[in-house]
Amino acid sequence: MSPQISDIKKYAFHVGDSFLFDANIWMLIYGPIANMDGRTEVYSAALREIRKNNCLIFIDILILSEFINAFSRFEFNQLNPIIKPQKFKDFRNSAQFKSIAQEISINARKIIKICCRCDSMFESADLPNVLTRYEQGNSDFNDQMIVEICKSKDLMLVTHDADFKPEDINILTANKKLLKNP
Protein backbone atom coordinates (compact mmCIF):
# COMPACT_ATOMS: atom_id res chain seq x y z
CA MET A 1 0.00 0.00 0.00
CA SER A 2 1.21 3.49 -0.66
CA PRO A 3 1.39 5.60 2.47
CA GLN A 4 -1.38 8.06 3.06
CA ILE A 5 -1.38 10.81 5.65
CA SER A 6 -4.93 11.97 6.38
CA ASP A 7 -6.48 14.69 8.48
CA ILE A 8 -8.09 13.01 11.47
CA LYS A 9 -10.70 15.78 11.65
CA LYS A 10 -12.00 14.80 8.19
CA TYR A 11 -11.62 11.03 8.39
CA ALA A 12 -14.76 8.85 8.25
CA PHE A 13 -14.30 5.99 10.71
CA HIS A 14 -15.73 2.61 9.68
CA VAL A 15 -16.41 -0.68 11.43
CA GLY A 16 -13.36 -2.85 10.80
CA ASP A 17 -10.85 0.01 10.94
CA SER A 18 -7.97 -0.75 13.29
CA PHE A 19 -5.65 1.80 14.85
CA LEU A 20 -2.49 2.15 16.88
CA PHE A 21 -2.32 5.36 18.91
CA ASP A 22 1.15 6.79 19.42
CA ALA A 23 2.12 7.72 23.00
CA ASN A 24 1.82 11.43 22.18
CA ILE A 25 -1.89 10.91 21.47
CA TRP A 26 -2.42 9.13 24.77
CA MET A 27 -0.59 12.01 26.48
CA LEU A 28 -3.01 14.48 24.89
CA ILE A 29 -6.06 12.45 25.91
CA TYR A 30 -5.07 10.99 29.31
CA GLY A 31 -1.83 12.75 30.20
CA PRO A 32 -1.12 15.69 32.49
CA ILE A 33 -1.44 18.18 29.62
CA ALA A 34 -4.88 16.98 28.53
CA ASN A 35 -6.77 19.97 29.90
CA MET A 36 -4.15 22.51 28.83
CA ASP A 37 -3.76 21.65 25.16
CA GLY A 38 -6.12 22.54 22.32
CA ARG A 39 -5.19 19.37 20.43
CA THR A 40 -6.85 17.30 23.15
CA GLU A 41 -10.36 17.91 21.83
CA VAL A 42 -9.43 16.88 18.28
CA TYR A 43 -8.00 13.53 19.36
CA SER A 44 -10.63 12.96 22.05
CA ALA A 45 -13.33 13.49 19.42
CA ALA A 46 -11.59 10.98 17.15
CA LEU A 47 -11.42 8.49 20.03
CA ARG A 48 -15.16 8.91 20.61
CA GLU A 49 -15.86 8.31 16.90
CA ILE A 50 -13.59 5.26 16.84
CA ARG A 51 -15.41 3.77 19.80
CA LYS A 52 -18.85 4.72 18.44
CA ASN A 53 -18.04 2.90 15.18
CA ASN A 54 -16.72 -0.20 16.98
CA CYS A 55 -13.25 0.19 15.53
CA LEU A 56 -10.32 -1.47 17.26
CA ILE A 57 -7.47 0.34 18.98
CA PHE A 58 -4.29 -1.60 19.66
CA ILE A 59 -1.51 -0.90 22.11
CA ASP A 60 1.84 -2.52 22.73
CA ILE A 61 4.30 -2.33 25.59
CA LEU A 62 6.52 0.27 23.84
CA ILE A 63 3.69 2.78 23.61
CA LEU A 64 2.40 2.13 27.12
CA SER A 65 5.94 2.48 28.47
CA GLU A 66 6.48 5.73 26.53
CA PHE A 67 3.20 7.10 27.93
CA ILE A 68 4.12 6.20 31.51
CA ASN A 69 7.65 7.57 31.21
CA ALA A 70 6.59 10.78 29.43
CA PHE A 71 3.89 11.41 32.06
CA SER A 72 6.44 10.85 34.86
CA ARG A 73 9.06 13.11 33.27
CA PHE A 74 6.48 15.82 32.61
CA GLU A 75 5.53 15.83 36.30
CA PHE A 76 9.22 15.88 37.30
CA ASN A 77 9.93 18.83 35.01
CA GLN A 78 6.99 20.78 36.46
CA LEU A 79 8.37 20.65 40.00
CA ASN A 80 9.46 23.84 41.69
CA PRO A 81 13.28 23.95 41.47
CA ILE A 82 13.44 24.50 45.24
CA ILE A 83 11.94 21.08 45.97
CA LYS A 84 12.93 19.28 42.77
CA PRO A 85 15.43 16.45 43.26
CA GLN A 86 18.47 16.71 41.02
CA LYS A 87 17.90 13.29 39.49
CA PHE A 88 14.71 11.88 38.04
CA LYS A 89 15.34 8.51 39.72
CA ASP A 90 15.47 10.22 43.11
CA PHE A 91 12.09 11.77 42.35
CA ARG A 92 10.67 8.45 41.19
CA ASN A 93 11.80 6.80 44.43
CA SER A 94 10.39 9.57 46.65
CA ALA A 95 7.19 9.63 48.69
CA GLN A 96 6.21 12.66 46.60
CA PHE A 97 6.04 10.45 43.50
CA LYS A 98 3.55 7.96 44.98
CA SER A 99 0.44 10.05 44.22
CA ILE A 100 1.76 10.80 40.73
CA ALA A 101 2.41 7.10 40.11
CA GLN A 102 -1.16 6.40 41.20
CA GLU A 103 -2.51 9.02 38.79
CA ILE A 104 -0.39 7.60 35.96
CA SER A 105 -1.60 4.08 36.73
CA ILE A 106 -5.25 5.20 36.76
CA ASN A 107 -4.82 6.73 33.31
CA ALA A 108 -2.82 3.77 31.97
CA ARG A 109 -5.65 1.50 33.09
CA LYS A 110 -8.13 3.68 31.17
CA ILE A 111 -6.01 3.18 28.07
CA ILE A 112 -5.63 -0.58 28.35
CA LYS A 113 -9.33 -0.95 29.12
CA ILE A 114 -10.26 0.35 25.65
CA CYS A 115 -7.39 -1.23 23.71
CA CYS A 116 -6.48 -4.64 22.38
CA ARG A 117 -2.98 -5.65 23.36
CA CYS A 118 -0.49 -6.59 20.68
CA ASP A 119 3.11 -7.67 20.82
CA SER A 120 5.98 -5.38 19.95
CA MET A 121 7.10 -7.46 16.94
CA PHE A 122 10.58 -7.81 18.43
CA GLU A 123 10.85 -11.46 17.38
CA SER A 124 9.68 -10.95 13.81
CA ALA A 125 10.81 -7.41 12.96
CA ASP A 126 13.61 -6.96 10.46
CA LEU A 127 15.91 -5.58 13.16
CA PRO A 128 19.02 -5.32 10.96
CA ASN A 129 17.04 -3.08 8.59
CA VAL A 130 15.56 -1.09 11.49
CA LEU A 131 19.07 -0.54 12.88
CA THR A 132 20.41 0.42 9.45
CA ARG A 133 17.72 3.11 9.19
CA TYR A 134 18.40 4.17 12.78
CA GLU A 135 22.15 4.59 12.26
CA GLN A 136 21.44 7.11 9.50
CA GLY A 137 20.55 9.41 12.39
CA ASN A 138 17.21 10.75 11.26
CA SER A 139 14.67 8.40 12.80
CA ASP A 140 13.65 7.24 16.23
CA PHE A 141 14.11 3.53 16.99
CA ASN A 142 10.75 3.20 18.77
CA ASP A 143 9.00 4.99 15.90
CA GLN A 144 10.47 2.46 13.50
CA MET A 145 9.22 -0.39 15.67
CA ILE A 146 5.77 1.24 15.72
CA VAL A 147 5.85 1.25 11.91
CA GLU A 148 6.74 -2.45 11.96
CA ILE A 149 3.76 -3.17 14.22
CA CYS A 150 1.41 -1.18 11.98
CA LYS A 151 2.68 -2.92 8.85
CA SER A 152 2.43 -6.42 10.30
CA LYS A 153 -1.06 -5.93 11.75
CA ASP A 154 -2.42 -3.60 9.02
CA LEU A 155 -3.06 -0.82 11.54
CA MET A 156 -3.48 2.87 10.87
CA LEU A 157 -1.22 5.01 13.05
CA VAL A 158 -2.72 7.94 14.93
CA THR A 159 0.07 10.36 15.83
CA HIS A 160 0.85 14.04 16.25
CA ASP A 161 4.59 13.46 15.81
CA ALA A 162 5.76 15.66 12.93
CA ASP A 163 9.02 13.72 12.75
CA PHE A 164 7.24 10.56 11.65
CA LYS A 165 8.56 9.54 8.27
CA PRO A 166 5.99 8.44 5.71
CA GLU A 167 6.42 4.71 5.44
CA ASP A 168 4.24 1.93 4.09
CA ILE A 169 1.52 2.71 6.62
CA ASN A 170 -1.47 5.01 6.75
CA ILE A 171 -1.32 7.84 9.27
CA LEU A 172 -4.10 9.93 10.80
CA THR A 173 -3.11 13.24 12.34
CA ALA A 174 -4.14 16.81 13.05
CA ASN A 175 -0.53 17.97 12.74
CA LYS A 176 -0.36 20.48 9.87
CA LYS A 177 3.36 19.86 9.31
CA LEU A 178 2.83 16.12 8.98
CA LEU A 179 -0.17 16.65 6.69
CA LYS A 180 2.06 18.65 4.31
CA ASN A 181 4.38 15.63 3.90
CA PRO A 182 4.16 14.14 0.40
Question: Can you say where each PLM-predicted feature lies in the sequence?
Answer:
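Acidic, PIN/NYN-like endoribonuclease modules and their adjacent C-terminal/linker elements
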Residues: 1-14, 133, 147-182
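Short, well-structured N-terminal submotif of metal-dependent ribonuclease cores
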Residues: 1-63, 70-87, 153
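Active-site neighborhoods of divalent-metal-dependent phosphate/nucleic-acid chemistry enzymes
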Residues: 2-3, 101-156
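Acidic active-site catalytic centers that drive phospho-/nucleotidyl reactions
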Residues: 22-24, 143, 161
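Short, solvent-exposed loop/turn segments at secondary-structure junctions
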Residues: 26-27, 63-66, 163-165, 178
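Well-ordered, non-membrane alpha-helical segments in soluble/globular domains
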Residues: 37-46, 98-108
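A short acidic, often aromatic-flanked loop/helix-cap motif at beta-alpha or helix-coil junctions
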Residues: 65, 122-128, 177-182
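Helix-adjacent hinge/juxtasegments
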Residues: 77-103
